[in-house]
Design a protein with these regions (language model features):
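Edge beta-strands of extracellular beta-sandwich domains
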Residues: 45, 72-73
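Short arginine-rich
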Residues: 58-71
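A short, exposed loop/beta-hairpin motif centered on an aromatic-Gly-Thr core
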Residues: 38-52
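A charge-rich, low-complexity, intrinsically flexible signal that marks solvent-exposed coils, linkers
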Residues: 3-5, 73
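Short aromatic-glycine-(Arg/Gly/Cys) micro-motifs in beta-strand/loop hairpins
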Residues: 18-42
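N-terminal acidic leader/helix
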Residues: 5-21
């Protein structure tokens, strides 16, 4: 059973042979969102609220979509 503090993959994308995904780590006081490209963490950012972290992840997803990335399962 998952709890509200379990890490969750928010989205997965690909472009050619490259892959990307965002993972969110809810926590007490801070929520961390991370981005991985080709299985390597590119960056991690901490936010004061879950809503801010989700908004940032969506912003990055939108940038990738405009850059030719496609959503995958």
């Amino acid at each position: 059973m998952m709890s509200s503090s379990d890490p969750t993959v928010l989205w997965r994308m690909s472009r050619g042979r490259s892959t990307a995904h965002a993972t969110i780590f809810p926590g007490d006081g801070l929520t961390t969102v991370t981005w991985f490209f080709d299985g390597v963490m590119d960056r991690a950012e901490n936010y004061d609220t879950l809503d801010l972290a989700l908004a940032r992840a969506e912003q990055i997803r939108g940038i990738l979509l405009k850059d030719g990335w496609k959503e995958t399962a």
